[in-house]
Amino acid sequence: LIMIDAAIEAGEPIEEIINELIELGAIDAIVGMHLSAVRQRLSKMVRQRIPYIYTPLYEGGETTPGLFAIGETPQEQLGPAMAMLQQAFRPRKWALIGNDYVWPRSSHSFAKTCLKQMNVDLAMECYVPFGLPSMTGLVDRLEASGADAVLVSLVGQDAVNFNRVFGRRGLHKSILRLSCALEENGLMACGEGNLERLFSVSSYFGSISTDANACFKERYYAMHGEIGPALNALGQSTYEGLHYLSVLLRDFGDIWRGRSTQDGLPVIHESGRSFERNGKKERPSIYLARADGVQFCDFKLL
């Protein structure tokens, strides 16, 4: 097992590294938990030489042969979450804030369609580079926009920094927050006092009470003990990706070369997530959760 840091800020020449490993026969598959921007670059280089499992939530529409994206899409996740919050809180205007790359832009394009269907106004749409030195100006713009709700599609430390400034400003009193990518570790980093009226939508939360998660947690804590890293959607997706890869190769042999995400191969694999049948496919159950301190609670099945 070779671990490679594919984070943008790591500055690694990821395409060169992976290409060299493939050519040397040093790797037989990729299980990737990284940004969609990295996936798009790698998919052009891998070219079906080895199977590529992409594990986190993403913007949808992946059709590259030999690449299997197993995470949820905005249609499954974002749309139902916005609809539930709109019904519960009746915000008159939404703001859309994200990092400047394909996943936030594609997700926000879908969000704008949802807002139009719900007859709700868009107060602000803004994209910022990774590693923005200060979130103060962005939060200033949000506060002045008149938005009652904000979809936060910032990732990593940018999401943490935004929520800290937002919380210190006390904007939760007038603006609710929704995130599709804030998990348990990010929640702890934001700080307990900065998380009021913050909602997250995901197919997995570490504390959710399902049979699948109970089995997963039992195995996890048996191996790592109670001091193991907090269970979260991104970590679970990597675990699931390895099991998906194993079953894909065991049950389907080399058929993966001509197949892709859209083909919906019946790969029945171990997961901490629960699944529901949607037509001929099984898709993950999606939940909306509310931050309570540095934990998620009040899970609603969407």
What annotation goes with each model-predicted range?
Residues G71-C126:
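An alpha-beta-alpha
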Residues L21-H34, I53-T55, A95-L96, G146-Q157, ...:
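Periplasmic-binding protein-like
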Residues G61-A83, E125-C126, L195-Y204:
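Short beta-strand elements at the ligand-binding edges of bilobed clamshell
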Residues A222-G235, S246-K300:
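Segments of small-molecule ligand-sensing domains
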Residues L1-G60:
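Beta-alpha junction/loop-to-helix N-cap segments that form part of ligand/metal-binding clefts
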Residues V38-Q40, L78, P104, M135, ...:
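Short, well-ordered alpha-helical microsegments
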